[in-house]
Amino acid sequence: MLSLKAAFAQHTRNNTRKEKARLLKLSINGRFLTQSLTGVQRYAAEIVKAMDGLLASGNAAPQLLDAEWQILVPPAATTLGELRRIKVKQVGTLQGHAWDQIDLARAAAGTRLISLANSGPVLHRDHLVVIHDAQVFKRRDFFSRKYLALHRTLGRLLARTATIATVSTFSRNELASVLALDPASIPIIPNSAEHFASVEPDFSIIESLRLEPHRFFLFVGSMTKNKNVDTAIRAAERLGRADFPLVVVGGDNDKVFGGGATQSSGGIVRAGRLKDEHVAALFARAAAFVFPSLYEGFGIPPLEAMYFACPVIASSAAAVRETCADAAVYFDPLDADELSAKMRERIDLGRISPLEQAKQRERLATYSWTKSAAAMLQVLAKPVRQIGPDGTAR
């Protein structure tokens, strides 16, 4: 027979096990750490780091502070740096969507799963998935047929089994339409440009590219149909100012988009992929940032430009207007002549004015990774799919 002391110890252990079993367990889909860095992967990384900071400082609902947190990653994943509350765990042997649907699904079983980069296990029920836009439904001309078929199917299946979140009011309405969802059921958890706060500009790139400060226009983005670099290049050619070249920063992605890169021509400086320190320097020294996207779910690069007080000449796409408001000048992204005229106006205006800078600061203050992470934690603190009429957790 157990002594009173031993019985008490066993009772305590049993209660501890029961308490641990009752704790909320949350898993983050870390597949984005194996992907090339675009706005989607940037979003996922910054949200994870900001959530970790809030959890470490005690700024979350009690059940989330007491919860077990982990980010599940495939083999060969990059690192996020030091995380204080979220444990990193490598799982599985597969890659890509197979890892999502098999390895991750198995490892995340019984936990609340957060997928921040457009896809995740379609059979996992307690699941929050951030889908950043509705491009695969609205602009089929941007993608290969194989990519369209896969991602449309994923989107429709996830809409049935998971809570869908997104990054803007525009994207919420688009996704609600194509996925037959109530817009009020889709939380909005936006992007930010705060990641550049820790980036020290490396101005050596100005000399390396043989540029004159404040005498060049800047495009930053992938060479894809959606990013519409062709219009920017045609506008620069029609501008006819060799002393104000267009610097094109970014890489290609033919595998996904079936081709879309444009060849270099006169007055164009093709810089290729650059590290953040060089991009920051170009933002800080450009005459203006040109953003001709045909379709966006949010539009991070204009905010990044504003962070360095760079004037923004942006596409009139709805999500871009939502993000930039009156802190940018707009043009029809299909009209190279209109963009060329806006570039000429910027040359005539010269450096950014105090009023323009004030408008930029107002837009930047609207968006914060910490605010977005707090919104994410608010949603995660509630039962799955329990979303209020304004798109926030109830």
Where on the chain are the PLM-derived regions?
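Carbohydrate transferase catalytic cores enriched for Leloir-type hexosyltransferases
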Residues: 3-394
